[in-house]
Each structure stands twice: as structure tokens, then as C-alpha cells.
Amino acid sequence: MLSPIEAIVGLVTFTFLFYFLWTKKSQKPSKPLPPKIPGGWPVIGHLFHFNDDGDDRPLARKLGDLADKYGPVFTFRLGLPLVLVVSSYEAVKDCFSTNDAIFSNRPAFLYGDYLGYNNAMLFLANYGPYWRKNRKLVIQEVLSASRLEKFKHVRFARIQASIKNLYTRIDGNSSTINLTDWLEELNFGLIVKMIAGKNYESGKGDEQVERFKKAFKDFMILSMEFVLWDAFPIPLFKWVDFQGHVKAMKRTFKDIDSVFQNWLEEHINKREKMEVNAEGNEQDFIDVVLSKMSNEYLGEGYSRDTVIKATVFSLVLDAADTVALHINWGMALLINNQKALTKAQEEIDTKVGKDRWVEESDIKDLVYLQAIVKEVLRLYPPGPLLVPHENVEDCVVSGYHIPKGTRLFANVMKLQRDPKLWSDPDTFDPERFIATDIDFRGQYYKYIPFGSGRRSCPGMTYALQVEHLTMAHLIQGFNYRTPNDEPLDMKEGAGITIRKVNPVELIIAPRLAPELY
């Protein structure tokens, strides 16, 4: 099988014409172009620069190093598309304030066609009538504060059940528990319950859900794989599959869609039997969307069923993966900073006590816990480069001319560790957020863990509710130490997201009365 680079080289002669057409300018811009990193080749651009360079750090770290060399605004080419990387307050504000509407489109990636319901998923859809209508539905009917309030008891019950499960795993003073796996199970089970009304437990769930979990992990891998068409978006290359990724995408999508289709049919049948509003039957997210969405096409050629399944998939991706990832980093930071952990425990003991568990209504009084969550999101934002944007027309960023069709990476990780904006930027210090009004809403352009502007994350409120409540329970309920009494390894994995290479494995001990578990 040909490697990605061999495939490119073999087809390079077919791309010269398209390359020159792609890069041709009708007139010279009045503003200068941003700095471009050296080493680019004709046609393929800087693909070699990021291809197996022996650096296994996250892409955000690599791009951060380039910003140190070439400045907080620079460009490079991944094949034909031009990529703009920004990491300064001024440039980020230009992109998500002044030019917010211009940068509201999404670049086309092949996985969006084959895995993302032909880009019907909310985070993949281009800015336009379909996206606006679907986002409005999600924000007002599915992820609104009032709707999430109705699911408050579901979140609490699920977290309580998982805490009890964690307690039963304690075996003396030497049993090591994989907290990373526990967090993944908790968040996956919680979102499945809220979306489809299903109770899922590892090893006890139905076969379909287990198959979906496998397909979900395959999606995460395939969506980050290099595909020829992504670098050379030419119709001919859409059907070239030297690497076998398209075949794998189709197979994975089939497994994912079969689960969502089954859930959808169950809910449609339930509605037909008029069981949705029967006493004792709660409305989950699919019930809500079915009640609000007509059976008509919603634009862009999507059917109602496709939109529902695509929306469900978007919610699962955000809730099951990024939330667990963030809490995992948060607990690792606390274990390595025992003074902060002790202070958080003392705050909960004082404000809540030790004779009941923290509830969502308590969070507003737990100021130090809120500061911890903010600081974890500063150091390890769930989307360190955000989802890529693309400008629909020429614009100006930090005084530079940015041609139409440029792909935008906002290096949030670099921005939120900028020593010009943050003191001791690489140090875990929740105190920095105690006497400040900086929040998560994306209006403080030095702190945008959930993005900013029109394309900011619609699931932010849900994510913060789960993160605060889960971390509060873990802080309140247990004491922790590492198996070797050494600090946890904080090595970051390669790729677009920031995953901890090694799981958080701990020896835990309860700190509340046994009857509370």
C-alpha cells in the first residue's frame, strides 16, 4: 500500500494546473501577507514539515514553537490550502470579533462527508440557513439552561452511581484504580442516558452501544488521519483511496449510524404509541428534538432523521470525549498539587459539610472549585486549536491581508500560556482567577477555551455543569496518592487534541462516612 507521501508524489503532475489556479490573484493586495514559514515545496507546501518529524507533542505545541520563531500570526500550506495560525490577543480578537462573520465557515474535510452525515453535524456545517436553524434548535430546546435544569437529577444520580462504583473498587491500601477509564465510562453513560434514555454500564450495556463505543474510537482516529483530498480538494482525488481510509470511514459510519437509527426508531415508535408524555416517562433529547422538528427537509438536502442523528452524534462527541478529557487533566493537576487539592476539600467541607454530597446548587458558593476548573481549561483547553475556520472573503488580521479560502487555526493553548497575558503561564495556579471576572463566554480574547463568536461551543453550559459536579464529588469523596508516591507523568500525546499519554492511576481512600457511598 502506498504511503501518503508516495501517493502525493505519484499524483503531483496532475495538480500543478490546479495549484496555479488556486494561488492566482486577480490583483495585488493593499496589505502585506503574513509571514510564511520557510521550507515549503511547490504544490505540496509544508506537508513534509509535519510528516513524521519525530516530535510526538500535540500539534498546538509545535505551532507554538513556530510562533516563537515567526510571530503570533503566520501561514503555511498543507497541500493547496493556505493555513493561518494566530495566537495573540489582538489577532484572535480580529478573527472572532471584527471578522467573526467572515471566518464562520468550515473547511471541507473528507471525514465530514463520510463520517459526519455529509457535514450535517453542527460543528461541520457551513455558516448559513441550515446551520443557524439547527444551532437555534440545539441551544433553545436541547442545551438551554431550562432544559438542562430538568435533567439535573439525571446528572446527579449518574454521578452518584459512578461514585458508588468507584467506592466498591477500593480494596485496602494497595489497589490501584484507573481514574481515566472511570471518567470515560461516566461521561459516556451520562450522555447516552440524557440523549436516548438508556442506562449504560460497561460490560452490562446492550451490544449496540458496545459496538458504538468501538466505532466512536475509530471515528476519533479516522477524523485525524491524513487524507489526500484534504490537502488537494480536487474532485478527482475524492475517489482516490490509496490509504484505505475512505473504506474504513464507510465501515465505521455504518456501525455508528445503525445505533443512532435504532435509537431514533425506538423513539418514533414510542411517540406513535403516545407513550412520551405518559406518567413516569421522561423526555430525553431525542424526544425533545422529535417534538420540535417537522418531517420536512430542513435545507441543504437533509432529511429530519439525518439532522437528528447528526445532532445526536455531535452531542455525544462533545460530551463523552472532551468533558472526560478535561476532568482527567484536572484531577491529574490536583494530584500533583496537593495544596490546591486540600484547599478545595476544605472549601467543600466548610460550605457543604461532610454529611451530604455536593449538589449543583452548591457550585455557585464554591469559589475555589470554580477557579480550579477555569485554570484547568486555561492550561488544557479541550480544543487547543479550536475547530478550523475558513474565511468566505478577503479580510485583514493584525494588519495582514488574508485571502479568501484561508483555513484558520486559533492556537488557544499558546494564547492562554502567553507570558504577556498571564504571569507564570505554565504554572497551575487557580488563585489567578479568584479576583477576576474572566469567564468562559469568549468575550475575553485572552481566554477562549470554548471558542468565541458565532462558532463557539454550544455545549459549554452542559460541559461546565458536569465538570464542576464531577470534580466536586471526586474532591469531596476521596483522598488520593500515586502508587509510587511520585508525581503523575503529565506527558501530552501527539495529535490535534491534548490527551494525556498515561492514564491517571491512583490509590484512593474514602473521606466520608460509608453510608454516603
Curated annotation (Swiss-Prot):
Keyword Coiled coil: no
Reported tissue expression: Expressed in leaves.
Enzyme Commission number: 1.14.14.-
GO biological process: alkaloid metabolic process; nicotine biosynthetic process
Annotated GO CC locations: membrane
Cell compartment(s), UniProt: Membrane
Cross-linked sites for Glycyl lysine isopeptide (Lys-Gly) (interchain with G-Cter in ubiquitin): 254
Requisite cofactors: heme
Topology of the protein relative to the lipid bilayer: Single-pass membrane protein
Transmembrane segments: 2-22
Pfam (any one): p450
Key words of the record: Alkaloid metabolism, Heme, Iron, Isopeptide bond, Membrane, Metal-binding, Monooxygenase, Oxidoreductase, Transmembrane, Transmembrane helix, Ubl conjugation
Statement: the UniProt record of this protein carries the keyword DNA-binding: no
Listed pathway(s): Alkaloid biosynthesis; nicotine biosynthesis
Any GO molecular function: monooxygenase activity
Catalytic reactions on record: (S)-nicotine + reduced [NADPH--hemoprotein reductase] + O2 = (S)-nornicotine + formaldehyde + oxidized [NADPH--hemoprotein reductase] + H2O + H(+)
SUPFAM superfamilies per record: Cytochrome P450
Residues noted as binding heme in the record, renumbered to the chain: 457
Family in the record: Belongs to the cytochrome P450 family. CYP82E2 subfamily.
Task of the protein: Involved in the biosynthesis of pyridine alkaloid natural products, leading mainly to the production of anabasine, anatabine, nicotine and nornicotine, effective deterrents against herbivores with antiparasitic and pesticide properties (neurotoxins); nornicotine serves as the precursor in the synthesis of the carcinogen compound N'-nitrosonornicotine (NNN). Catalyzes the demethylation of nicotine to form nornicotine.
PANTHER family to which the protein is assigned, alphabetical: CYTOCHROME P450 82C3-RELATED (PTHR47947), CYTOCHROME P450 82E3 (PTHR47947:SF1)
Protein name: Nicotine N-demethylase CYP82E4
Provenance organism: Nicotiana tomentosiformis
Gene that encodes the chain: CYP82E4
